[in-house]
Structures are given as C-alpha cells and as structure tokens.
Amino acid sequence: VTETAGDIGGPPLAAGPRNPGAPEFPRLIQALRLLQERVTAADPPSDVVTEAAETLEKLSATLEPFSVSEAEQVAGHRLDLPGRGQALLPPYEVAEWDEHHVLAHVRLTRFYLGRNAAHGGVLCLLFDEILGRLANTGPSLARTAYLHVNYRGVTPIGPRLRLEASVDRVEGRKCFVSGRLHDGDTLTADAEGLFVSLLPGQP
C-alpha cells in the first residue's frame, strides 16, 4: 500500500497514527460494528431490549470521562484499520493508494441496508470519504465543495465491492476527482467531486 494522505487522511501509514490508542482499540471498534449489525437485525422481546439498553447506557457512562478533543481522538485517525477505525464509515480497506489514484474494497453489511440494497446515502458517504482523502493527499487541507453521485444500478449488501478513485485535474486550489463502485464487472455507482484547499486561517 502506498499512502501519503494529508490532514483528513492523516500521516503516512509507515509513520503510524498520531494517537494509536490502547492496544485493544481495534477490538472495541469491531465489537461496536458487530453491535450495530445485531441491533439492526434484531426484534427482541421487551425485557431483552431493556437489558441491552441499560448495558449500553452503562458503557457510555464508562467511556464519558475519557473524552478528548477531535485532534486527540483515536476513531477516524487509524489508517491501518478498516474505515479508519470510525464505526460510522463502511469498513473499506485500501489496496493501492498514491497521489493520483486509489483502489479499495468494501463489503456493505445489513447495517447499511436501504430497501433490498445498499442505502443511497451510504454510497454518498463512501464516495465523500474516499474522494476526500484522495484530494487531501499532501500537506494542504481541502473540503468538499461539490459531490455528485450517479446510481447506475443496485449496490448489493454482502458481496465484496471494488471502489476506484482518481484525480482528474488540479486547477490552483481546486482538485477535481472521480470515483467508481463495482460489483464484479458491474458498475453500480460513480461520482465526481470538487475539493477546494483552504486558505490560511480557514477552519
């Protein structure tokens, strides 16, 4: 894997995450992803719902004293983990990455289900994540100015999908990127985006 992402993507993989967190952090995120799946698919009786809710409330209270700033948080900064260790993101895994192109794979699960297919908003999130990190390869921070997604077919839940993205051109502070999502040989969605580098002092 070749990866040299900027402020959104973080430091190069070889340098390691800014704050890797506790050794068991990957296990925590994996358990959270599994919980999302179980809750999505479950229709438990009232007593089980009550017990589960109370358990989750206790876990939230356990973690609350350890809240840190965005810059210090572990979730979202672990480039070595699927989806950067951010449970909101589909757990994509990078196969190839450089300044001009990315190849990644993702398996969308029931948590990301719309109606008999992947939720369209999830695909927007996935494209914004991958295209945004590609546009942020380098020292400058860029933000999404425009993102257009075309739904070319049904994106299924379950199969291993292929996601490719590339930088089409750069004009000053503007970076134009595009991406394609495939289920085997079938194009299920594509996207084009514009990301603009921030000026000094811009948040």
Task: Please describe what each predicted stretch is.
Residues 2-70, 155-157, 168-203:
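HotDog/MaoC-like acyl-thioester-processing domains
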Residues 3-16, 129-162, 195:
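Hydrophobic beta-strand-centered segment that forms part of the acyl-chain substrate-binding groove
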Residues 85-88, 142, 160, 172-174:
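Short solvent-exposed loop/turn micro-motifs enriched in small/polar/acidic residues
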Residues 97-101, 118-141:
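Active-site helix/loop of acyl-thioester processing domains in fatty-acid/polyketide metabolism
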